[in-house]
């Protein structure tokens, strides 16, 4: 893909995103990684000084109890399965170091994907502010 445009639940000043409030973050991440440019459109409530929980998780149903123990503190969402049949949960712990947390979550058996999107994926963020918008560029090609 040349260009992918999507929203975000949180946008940090350094370009880290939390996505997946709707439970489709695995597919969203695949599409964003496949695109040459990934542009996020957000309203003025989405930029945050620092990321915080909850961070969406997609988990395998097999070994769910063990996976939940390893990613604690976390809770299961009372929602349907993801588009690919995964169980949707939320991580509620600290997100002060999103890079380390992303590695930890990605390395946990049973975690299909998490909703942390690193800044190297993000080309630009457009933040709507009433009748205008601010553009924040994160990588070349914007």
Regions found by a protein language model. Give the residues of each.
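Conserved phosphate- and dinucleotide-binding cores of soluble alpha/beta proteins
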Residues: 1-142
């Amino acid at each position: 893909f040349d260009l992918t445009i999507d929203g975000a639940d949180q946008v940090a000043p350094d370009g880290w995103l939390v996505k997946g409030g709707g439970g489709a973050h695995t597919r969203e991440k695949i599409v964003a990684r496949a695109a040459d440019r990934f542009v996020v459109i957000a309203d003025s409530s989405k930029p945050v000084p620092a990321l915080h929980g909850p961070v969406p998780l997609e988990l395998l149903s097999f070994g769910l109890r063990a996976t939940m123990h390893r990613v604690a503190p976390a809770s299961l969402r009372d929602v349907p399965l993801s588009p690919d049949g995964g169980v949707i949960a939320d991580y509620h712990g600290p997100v002060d170091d999103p890079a380390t947390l992303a590695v930890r979550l990605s390395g946990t058996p049973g975690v299909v994907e998490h909703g942390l999107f690193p800044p190297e994926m993000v080309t630009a963020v457009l933040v709507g502010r009433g009748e205008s918008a601010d553009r924040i560029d994160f990588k070349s090609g914007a």
